[in-house]
Swiss-Prot record:
Pfam families registered for this protein in UniProt: SfsA (PF03749), SfsA_N (PF17746)
Listed NCBIfam families: sfsA
GO MF term (any one): DNA binding
Superkingdom of source: Bacteria
Organism lineage: Bacteria, Pseudomonadati, Pseudomonadota, Alphaproteobacteria, Hyphomicrobiales
Family per record: Belongs to the SfsA family.
Name of protein: Sugar fermentation stimulation protein homolog
InterPro entries attached to this UniProt entry: SfsA, SfsA_C, SfsA_N
Length: 232
């Protein structure tokens, strides 16, 4: 996934109201940027952190700058939760995940379950449909170990239960965790932060839901799916 325009750099002053951040750009300008991330961004909002932002000249936008990357623990971390679906799609189409390769049709945001939309739907006539739910990951506490979630997510547990229903109906249910950072070689569920999600994940795996974790390679020019990493 290549950024359409060059990113600009600066230092984070603060994140607030969840969707806003104040940043001092390297050219000295003080700006307010939009933050495309509804999560806690635990460990990624320290004042003074190096940040990269995209810039839009669209006249309807209130904030021209959008936070895309934060430097944390000496590595680049993608924080835009609107990107993982695109990264996942590229990973599937490039056969990075062999078990999901070769489907004739890939559709986005299809209705399913209890008033939900599946991120990606893979279909191929005689093969089982694959319903793929994508989650963004950028939280670590232990060197090399990415974790999800970084806060309680009732919606995430609901999605797991809906994937169980998909499998029961004869299709494939898939959880795909996209790790938007360069420094992780393993993935785990953070059960201490959200025990309900951890139980839902174990229940889903026991009932046939597949799970994969993909690490990204991040630069100031692109964020690309790099390799599968083991789930612990």
């Amino acid at each position: 996934m290549i950024f359409q325009t060059p990113l600009v750099t600066g230092r984070l002053e603060r994140r607030y109201k969840r969707f806003l951040a104040d940043v001092t750009l390297d050219d000295g300008r003080f700006i307010t940027a939009s933050v495309p991330n509804t999560g806690s961004m635990l460990g990624l909002t320290a004042p003074g952190s190096r940040v990269w932002l995209s810039v839009s000249d669209a006249p309807h936008r209130k904030y021209a700058h959008t936070l895309q990357i934060v430097e944390a623990d000496n590595t680049l971390v993608g924080v835009n939760t609107g990107l993982p679906n695109r990264i996942a799609e590229e990973a599937i189409l490039n056969s990075l995940i062999p078990d999901l390769a070769g489907y004739a049709s890939l559709k986005r945001e299809q209705k399913y379950g209890r008033n939900s939309r599946i991120d990606l739907l893979l279909d191929d006539g005689p093969r089982q449909r694959a319903y793929v739910e994508v989650k963004n990951v950028h939280f670590i506490r232990t060197l090399g170990l990415a974790e999800f979630p970084d806060t309680v997510t009732a919606r995430g547990a609901k999605h797991l239960d809906e994937l169980v229903d998909v499998v029961a109906a004869g299709h494939r249910g898939v959880m795909l965790f996209i790790i938007q950072r360069n420094d992780c070689s393993r993935f785990s569920i953070s059960g201490d932060l959200d025990p309900t999600y951890a139980r839902a994940f174990e229940r889903a795996r026991a009932n046939g839901v597949e799970a994969w974790a993909v690490r990204c390679h991040i630069t100031d020019k692109s964020i690309d799916a790099s390799e599968l990493v083991p789930i612990e």
